[in-house]
Amino acid sequence: MSRTKSTKVLIIGAGVSGLKAAETILSKSFLTGDDVLVVEAQNRIGGRLKTTDTSQSKLGINYDLGASWFHDSLNNIVLNHMINDGLLDDEKDVYFDDKDLKTFSSTGEVPIVDKKLNRVLEDIEKYIQLYFNRNLGVPDLSLRDIVAQYFEKYNRLITEEQREYCGRMMRYLEFWFGISWDRISGKYAVTTHQGRNLLNKKGYGYLVESLAKRIPESSLLLEEPVNKIIRNNKDAGKRVLVETINGLQIFCDYLIVTVPQSILSLEESSPYSIKWEPKLPQRLVESINSIHFGALGKVIFEFDRIFWDNSKDRFQIIADHTDGDLSRELTELPKPFTYPLFAVNFGRVHNGKASLVILTQAPLTNYLETHPDQAWQYYQPMLQKLSINDEPIPDPINTIVTDWTTNPYIRGSYSTMYTNDDPSDLIISLSGDFEDLGISEPYIKFAGEHTTSEGTGCVHGAYMSGIYAADCILENIFRNDVTGYTIIG
């Protein structure tokens, strides 16, 4: 038997963009909890923000399994709001973990300073920018191919050691895009950042809790996966009908859709897809499919002692030379040093507690999240390189592996750029600001990190998109709704 609810504004998704949209609508208008409803597929709120409980750690540490940093810290609205709201002590709750990396390869420590390797990396990145900016119509190349092109063109100016290491060191960008470098778009590989990256020691769970406290509990519906949106509804005096797999029908006047791009792009035949009636315009469907979804994961190892140089913030272990198809689906554990390693030293972040937080990229993320018991087997030979005096390293006393790629409602980490991808159409179409683009209904808006050109893939991007979508809905209500709701501020 179907159940029904009716509300003025419905928000699909209780991630940071959905929660911020709901909080914005409630705080900027005289709408109440009866007027705003947030429906979430999972049994928790937060979306891709997830902070562990200390009970999951043998060392009493809270880990962010999703986003961990305040990126673009000079212009980060979330950082500023959390400090202004008293949620963050900028002296003890955050840490700039950007001391120069200590880098290793399978043969030992990499001579970063003596061989001027970072200077060559800077040159490679500048070459990539110049190549695509000077030739706006030039076909895209993968990061691997554009780096190879650089070495071919400037081989005469590069030393043997720089040739040996620098190409492999450029694979650090895999930890930004969540995919291997043979798939990363060269055109979008090098970006400009608005400030340093500030590690959130306290955890983003506090942001989620703070937003949720400003939304009535009755306005949050969990474990209700949406499977249909009827955007031209004629029943119950409401313009939109949303249905869930559990048989719940929700009628609303305004809708904000915040599900990840990975869900929007699913074929209708998938049991986790959302069916639209009428179907979305073909151009919008094409724009949704014009980008992809990355798989940045984490493997956390806790030990009974620190065996690495605890004066360092982070470690990088570069991969061996590999010419194969790095992006293919893994059916067995790859050899160590096939994919690079990036580790954050939580021993320095948390006062001597022996913990390393390792970032992973697709397809390794997908494999390890499916086979978490094999994580140590892959990383142990690589982490051995960090050992002081080359003493045998201990086995971990605790291992935590993320599960983002196995979560059917998320399916990865955040939007990313494959070679030949272009995010501009998607961002323009989902904004709803341009006539004949996106969908024609002004009472339906989209939000999420994939809908914005500022802070794409980041918490502050999702947060700002929630504010923007909410403001658009409120403006529409104020302009057109006969009930005459007032907007505050």
Curated annotation (Swiss-Prot):
The keyword Metal-binding does not apply. This is Corticosteroid-binding protein. The lineage of its organism: Eukaryota, Fungi, Dikarya, Ascomycota, Saccharomycotina. Keywords: Lipid-binding, Steroid-binding. To yeast FMS1. It comes from the Eukaryota. May be a flavoprotein with enzymatic activity. One of its GO terms (cellular component) is fungal biofilm matrix.
